[in-house]
Amino acid sequence: MKPYFSCVFVFCFLIKLLTGELNDLANHRMFSFHDGGVQISCNYPETVQQLKMQLFKDREVLCDLTKTKGSGNTVSIKNPMSCPYQLSNNSVSFFLDNADSSQGSYFLCSLSIFDPPPFQEKNLSGGYLLIYESQLCCQLKLWLPVGCAAFVAALLFGCIFIVWFAKKKYRSSVHDPNSEYMFMAAVNTNKKSRLAGMTS
């Protein structure tokens, strides 16, 4: 009985896929990073001829692009907010330059379709963009070798100081005049034997 249900499920999935009811617009990669900026891609169906694409940052309209066809198939593009964009047959890409952590937020693409009729409004895709500060990473890259070199130098200096101090302490304890042991002078054995011969 289970193989029957799995076959029915696979068959229904293939029918949805072939008829285009499966919406793959939300499965695209929305954010990509280029040269210190962020590219936000909003996809739409290729059959759309006239559209209005809006990029929302939370509830604020950040970018607004309208593509219409006039007489003689002339394409008119209006970009009242002067957002840098790139338009293709099935997507609009908006560019946010000099991305920093203050631009991290929830972004949403909203599509209004004028042609082909009927008029439709869709929220296509959304995602949360979190930008980490890259300057902190660069500072860490600089300070990491400097910190390691300073640590090695301090360790080397400490070892040299300990060895020097140990040698100094050893030398001072050997020649200490206040020691209870007296230094013995070297005795010449030849003189000793002569003295021994005189007494006998």
From Swiss-Prot:
Induction: Expression on T-cells is drastically induced by phorbol myristate acetate (PMA) and Ca-ionophore or the engagement of CD3 and CD28. Residues 167-200 are cytoplasmic. One of its GO terms (cellular component) is external side of plasma membrane. Coiled coil: none annotated. Keywords: Cell membrane, Disulfide bond, Glycoprotein, Immunoglobulin domain, Membrane, Signal, Transmembrane, Transmembrane helix. Strongly expressed in the spleen and lung. Lower expression seen in liver, kidney and testis. Disulfide bonds join C42-C109, C63-C83. It comes from the Eukaryota. Residues 1-20 form the signal peptide. GO terms for molecular function: signaling receptor activity. Residues 30-133 form the Ig-like V-type domain. GO terms for biological process: cell-cell adhesion; T cell costimulation; T cell tolerance induction; T follicular helper cell differentiation. The keyword Lyase does not apply. N-glycosylated. Glycans are attached at N89, N123. It is found in: Cell membrane. Residues 21-145 are extracellular. The chain crosses the membrane at residues 146-166. It is a single-pass type I membrane protein. Homodimer; disulfide-linked. Interacts with ICOSLG. Interacts with PIK3R1. Interacts with TBK1; this interaction is critical for the maturation of T follicular regulatory cells. Stimulatory receptor expressed in activated or antigen-experienced T-cells that plays an important role in the immune response. Upon binding to its ligand ICOSL expressed on antigen presenting cells (APCs), delivers costimulatory signals that enhances all basic T-cell responses to a foreign antigen, namely proliferation, secretion of lymphokines including IL10, up-regulation of molecules that mediate cell-cell interaction, and effective help for antibody secretion by B-cells. This is Inducible T-cell costimulator. The gene is Icos.
